[in-house]
């Protein structure tokens, strides 16, 4: 959603771009408005995936309010050490044309989706990532406690192979649906 806002070129998109490139986080009000607007669209009625939201307790509370009367919210925390985060992001690339993310494998630096040039993401510079990790520990880590007592909260080991992480997430979603629990 943030990348879409940036690509839109609107004043809000330009503001979002400046904040992200500086390693900051979007304030709760703007972020919640972006998310609830998107989740209110018809294609989200069958289900949705939020990556990186909520990031703060107030955002989580707004999401809880939005979810009233809807199917249970499954919350998955993908646990990963700071060292592994830094390692992975150091090799992450993005297509200049279509925005597709890719890993630097040393092969042809062209996007597999559109053929565009792959470049390092501005917001993945080491100092920016370290700043984001500091902000994460201060603002986002408390969400683990906020959600941990709920039956639909699951923690997944993010250091596994991507397919194994995905499988564990799918199992968590299926287990929550089977139990009919609510977050």
What are these regions (language model features)?
Residues 1-70, 81-87, 121:
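ATP-dependent small-molecule kinase phosphotransfer cores
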Residues 120-183:
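NTP-dependent small-molecule kinase module
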Residues 1-2, 82, 102, 160-162:
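Residue-level detector of flexible, active-site-proximal loop/helix-junction positions
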Residues 51, 69-93, 102-113, 119, ...:
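Conserved phosphate-donor/acceptor-positioning beta-strand/loop module used by diverse small-molecule
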Residues 21, 39-40, 68, 90, ...:
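Signal for well-folded cores of large energy- and translation-related assemblies
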